[in-house]
Amino acid sequence: MYKISCIHPTCRPSLARKTREKWMAYAKHPEEIEYITYFDSFDQKELKKKIWKEKNNVEVYSKYSFGIVKKCNAAAKLATSNCIIVATDDTIPEIDWDEKVIESADWNSEVVLNTSDGTEKFDKRAYMVKTVILSRKRYKKLGYILHPNFKHVYCDNFHTWISHKDDVVIKRKDIMFEHLHPSIGKSKIDQFYLNASTQEEYDYGLKVFQNLIKENFNKFEEKKLFKKYLDESDPHKKYILAYVLLSAGVDEAKLINNSQVSAKI
């Protein structure tokens, strides 16, 4: 059985295969990794073939679908390991990344790993979970890798929020999966990036995000997490709890005022 399943959604076949080569070359034990690349294809021969396998490399060919979400969830159905990682065209791991990931958690439990992606200097949202890495147990509980109501934008925001809400995140910022994102000048802007970055897509993603929070948060959870927030002494953990509560619509003044009272007590 493989220890890690990489699932890689893509509409850029050439770049995806080059990226896959780097992931496997940088792994300490590539033979323990299955790499599933899920392609948007316009080639009728590929579409008829549907799937190609060679050792631990799997390629799946499907008709075009916008964004990464649909392809991620379809690829995950083929994953066999207890640790599932979403690879992307513009994400490159560090040397021996696989060993570090495996040693970072009990992958038989329900867990989400939060690593570094090199954008922290520009992205000040310290709550964001970088690179989607989760256990099979977590995947099975959710029923998806990225919520299927999303197309692309904001899917990582909801992954972050629900992972923190459920308190399954393990912080390992010493592990790097570098995100070569065009917005910080690490790669060139292409048509896919432009299509995924329109105001319309952001508005759609935000609406889905807000609706899903409403569906996944109730007064009981608010009361439980609010008490946890008041009792928490670790500044970072308190910040994360504040993020979860504020995103769910809890009044900021309530957090500040009650936190001050709690500190006095």
PLM feature segments, named:
Residues 96-112:
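Conserved donor-nucleotide/metal-binding helix-loop-beta segment in metal-dependent transferases, i.e.
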Residues 62-79:
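Glycine-rich, basic loop-to-helix element that forms the pyrophosphate-binding segment
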Residues 136-153, 161-172:
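Aromatic-glycine-rich donor-binding/catalytic loop that engages nucleotide-sugar donors
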